[in-house]
Amino acid sequence: MKPTMALKPLVFALAALMAVAAQAGPAEKWKPTPAPTGTVAAAVTDTQVSKDNKFDDTKTLNNAGANGSLSNSKGNLGANIAAGSGNQQDNAAAITSSAGDAATVFAVADIYQESKDNKFTNKGTQNNALLNNSANNSSGNVGVNVAAGQGNQQKNNLAIVTADGKNVAAASNTEQVSLDNHFLNEASSKHSYKPQYVVNNAGLLNSANNASGNIGVNVAAGAGNQQSNTLTLGSGCTVCAAGTGSKLAF
């Protein structure tokens, strides 16, 4: 077969395809990919209120500890360890992802913790908070709070958004309020020859070693402490198919 004869079937097929396209109606013609118009969102809203309470820890021993925990872990880890009275603990995460099918993508974590008009009495109380050999060799976002005592507030927040869209936002808002609380810390000598004093011990030992990513660790002993670990990440393109884009992170 001559080369000219071998090309004839291909030429005929291309000509036929072009003829069909020429006869197609307006609705059947090729159209560009439409710009993203939707919205993808992940939101966490959380409220914790401790109000008008009375806590009496007389000669009480409060021990809060994390020993050999959260090591060799990956991803998002939130741990709260508390011992005592009137403590508030919370972990919140808002994660969203979109592959170019939305114009606006955002993740929001909005947290409110309130401790108000409470009465805390510590007489001869011992509070020990210890983080020992924990969160080692971990990667990702790790938030650890350890508290011993009364009226402590603990919080771990995470807001992450990844998208191909033109508008990307990640926001995390944490509000911790301690208002009009009464704390009484004094030695206790009742039924004892020697007074027993209030003791607060907070320790961090051999923890968070060889870890990568965002690591937040809080250790507190006593009364009325407020602890928070927050991470916000926003990742998107600056020039997308939908037009000029933007990245926002709060």
UniProtKB/Swiss-Prot annotation:
Keywords: Amyloid, Cell adhesion, Fimbrium, Repeat, Secreted, Signal. GO terms for cellular component: extracellular region; pilus. FapC_R repeats lie at residues 62-95, 127-160, 200-233. Its main location: other. Residues 96-126 are annotated as: Linker 1. Residues 1-24 form the signal peptide. The keyword Repeat applies. It is found in: Fimbrium; Secreted. A motif (Cys-X-X-Cys) lies at residues 237-240. GO terms for biological process: cell adhesion. Residues 161-199 are annotated as: Linker 2. Disruption phenotype: Deletion of just fapC in an overexpressing strain yields cells without amyloid fibrils. Deletion of the entire fapA-fapF six-gene locus shows no visible growth phenotype. The major functional amyloid subunit in this bacterium. Intrinsically disordered in its monomeric state. Upon overexpression of the endogenous six-gene locus (fapA-fapF) in situ, cells form large clumps during liquid growth, make large amounts of biofilm and produce amyloid fibrils. Expression of the 6 gene operon in E.coli strain BL21(DE3) induces flocculation and biofilm formation with copious extracellular fibrils. Belongs to the FapB/FapC family. The major component of purified amyloid fibrils. Forms fibrils in vitro; in the presence of FapA the fibrils are about 50% wider. Interacts with FapA. Fibrillates in vitro; this is inhibited by FapA. Fibrils are resistant to boiling in 2% (weight/vol) SDS and require >90% (vol/vol) formic acid to dissolve. Each of the three repeats is modeled as a beta-hairpin; the repeats and inserts are modeled to stack on top of each other, overall forming a beta-helix. Soluble monomeric FapC is predominantly disordered. This is Functional amyloid subunit FapC. It comes from Pseudomonas fluorescens.
